[in-house]
């Protein structure tokens, strides 16, 4: 009996170009209302769990060359949020590296770390799709069910379609976060710049006036800072 089925994301798309996909209005609504990347991921995890009638849905994103990180999950708590999944020792790691959607029809037959954890929490099968943005894989979108051999090729095509759509949303939020970091961080010191300092001061003052929340400001006098200004300009370190 088969243990795994592997699908190329492009093949799943090209072979199902005319196939419809139906999404709950609530899913699209709350996704559009999401203000942060974490809200996007939490919304996706919750609604994908419903759409695929899964016992667990999770999302991992690239953390570094060795690990993927579980950023959100819904349902079964086999693998907790913030868990670092070793790429070279996990099923999701293979999905990420190979950029292939893979269905493990019986996780109890796998010795990979995440499959072992799923098995220990009563899961029977899992289906993981790469979050593809162009030629780059951002992470994985994963569903699991307590029954073995539960997911179909049709569901694989649907999950990959949603994963491609969500990957674009994730990429946009990551780009916004990078732009916000550049706009609020001093290049020389790597700490918040004057613009961000003033924004925080205004926010804290507003909280103090409206809610009585106290705050403190510490001032440091740095010796020889004029030399830095003379060398790098007055905008540096501001």
Tell me the role of every PLM-derived stretch.
Residues 1-39, 50, 179:
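Signal-transmission linkers at sensory-effector interfaces
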Residues 62, 78-109:
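Regulatory sensory and allosteric helical modules in signal-transduction proteins
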Residues 133, 150-171:
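Amphipathic alpha-helical "output/dimerization" segments
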Residues 76, 139-150:
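Short beta-strand-to-loop transition segments that serve as allosteric relay/switch motifs
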Residues 29, 180-199, 220-233:
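Conserved nucleotide-binding and Mg2+-coordinating catalytic segments in signaling enzymes
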Residues 69, 78-80, 105-125, 145:
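Signal-transducing coupling segments at domain and membrane junctions
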Residues 46, 56-80:
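GAF sensory/regulatory domain recognition
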Residues 97-98, 114-138:
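Helix-to-coil/beta transition segments that act as allosteric "coupling" elements at the rims
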